[in-house]
C-alpha cells in the first residue's frame, strides 16, 4: 500500500487550477463535506469562484453543495481531471476536492485530513473490522489536520488533536465542532430555531454516514 501510494503521488496529475483536497481516513461521518463547503464559501467571500469537485455520478451531494454555496461551480465526475477542466470552463478559479484524501493520482496544493474525534477514540481496526480506510500513518500526507467532534467533548477532541500532532512538526492541527444550528424548510428556505422542537415528538430521517450522531444532536 505504501509503495503504491508513493508511486501514485510521484505520477500525480496536476490540475489546471490551485487545488485544495479534503478527505478522511475513516468511512464517512467526519464532516469532510461541510468543511469542503466552508472552504468554498471562504473563497467566495474573498472574491474567488470555487469549483467543488465530487467523485460521484450525481445524487444528493451536488445538491447539498449548490445549496450551501450557490456561487460555487459544482461538478460531479469520477474523473477528477475531466471535472477540473469542466469547472474551469464554467469560471472556477480554485478547486476544492471533496473526499479526495485517497485520490493519490491527482496533485493538490493543500491536503487536508479530517479526523472524527469519536472514531479516533474508538476502534483502531481497519475495514471490515473497524472504520478505518487507511492506517493512521497515512496522516503523514496531510498539510493540515482537522479534528471534528459531534457529541464528543471539547476535551476529547483536544486530546485527539494533541496525540495526532505529536511527531508531525510543521503540520497544523485544529479542532471543529459540528453542530445543528437551525431548522430550514426544504421548499420555503425559511429558518427556525431548534427550540421549536423542545418537548415535541418528531420523526428524524438522515442520509449521512453517521446518523446516530444526528439523532444525538437533536436530543441535546
Placement of each model-derived feature along the sequence:
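Rossmann-fold NAD(P)-dependent oxidoreductase module
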Residues: 38, 42, 98, 217
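Redox- and metal-dependent alpha/beta enzyme cores, enriched for Fe-S-associated oxidoreductases
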Residues: 190, 197-220
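Short, surface-exposed amphipathic charged segments that create phosphate/polyanion-binding patches used
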Residues: 88-91, 185-197
Amino acid at each position: 500500500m505504501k509503495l503504491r501510494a508513493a508511486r501514485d503521488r510521484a505520477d500525480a496529475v496536476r490540475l489546471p487550477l490551485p487545488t485544495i483536497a479534503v478527505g478522511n481516513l475513516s468511512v464517512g461521518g467526519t464532516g469532510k463535506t461541510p468543511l469542503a463547503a466552508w472552504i468554498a464559501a471562504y473563497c467566495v467571500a474573498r472574491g474567488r469562484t470555487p469549483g467543488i469537485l465530487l467523485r460521484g455520478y450525481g445524487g444528493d451531494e451536488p445538491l447539498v453543495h449548490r445549496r450551501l454555496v450557490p456561487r460555487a461551480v459544482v461538478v460531479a465526475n469520477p474523473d477528477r481531471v475531466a471535472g477540473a477542466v469542466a469547472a474551469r470552463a464554467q469560471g472556477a478559479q480554485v478547486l476544492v476536492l471533496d473526499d479526495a484524501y485517497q485520490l493519490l493520482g491527482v496533485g493538490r496544493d493543500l491536503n487536508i485530513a479530517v479526523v472524527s474525534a469519536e472514531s479516533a477514540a474508538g476502534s483502531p481496526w481497519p475495514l471490515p473490522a473497524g472504520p478505518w480506510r487507511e492506517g493512521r500513518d497515512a496522516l503523514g500526507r496531510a498539510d493540515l489536520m482537522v479534528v471534528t467532534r459531534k457529541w464528543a467533548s471539547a476535551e476529547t477532541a483536544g486530546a485527539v488533536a494533541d496525540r495526532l500532532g505529536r511527531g508531525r512538526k510543521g503540520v497544523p492541527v485544529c479542532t471543529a465542532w459540528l453542530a445543528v444550528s437551525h431548522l430550514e424548510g426544504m421548499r420555503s428556505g425559511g429558518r427556525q430555531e431548534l427550540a421549536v422542537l423542545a418537548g415535541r415528538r418528531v420523526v428524524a430521517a438522515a442520509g449521512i454516514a453517521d446518523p446516530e450522531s444526528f439523532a444525538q444532536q437533536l436530543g441535546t
